[in-house]
């Protein structure tokens, strides 16, 4: 193995572990899989193909979400009502994840990147409003008889996004659980982790049956996933005592960079 090859391997390991640790801490704090945060590292720092990014992100999200949910459940950050809503969401999410996985490989790379940019823009807008403070959203409570059907339908929508883009979907699911179903932010994060697990598995299984699980994607998943799991443990441990505001600001800047980069690529086409 030549010197240049060893340098490339060292760079790959450092970027993968470092970015995985950073995104894992954020995921542990907020209750996410961390997929959106990993997109710029995988696409631009590691220069991975889009399909490898999607598959690697799904695998890492599953490992991170599994650790997050286990630690949060042990800390008592879950309720019976939340589990009931989560179960209904899972039903819809499984169907959505399958459909989204199929759609992702029928779209051109340009359209898929445009979809990612749009999704990240929505996440950034919500995050900026949170950081500004004093901005609150309330859509009222859902009649109890409609809770489960609504949860299943919204799970379907988030599942489509998860399967198509390779994300766990917590950024979209948590606001729904808080604003529509009235769950506390910490319980909502735990519930979202639970829904993420089977959703990710379905999406990953479908990508595999279509032949899009490659050695490159698995290599990224192992290296970055190791850092993400360690970060998730750290983030979950400090969840109670930290507001995560500084991390949110860094996250917002990272999302902005990704959106600008994707937009410039699309404009050059």
Question: What residue spans do the PLM features occupy?
Answer:
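Residue-level recognition of oxygen-bearing side chains
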Residues: 37, 58, 172, 193, ...
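Alpha-helical transmembrane segments of polytopic integral membrane proteins
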Residues: 39, 63-66, 100, 121, ...
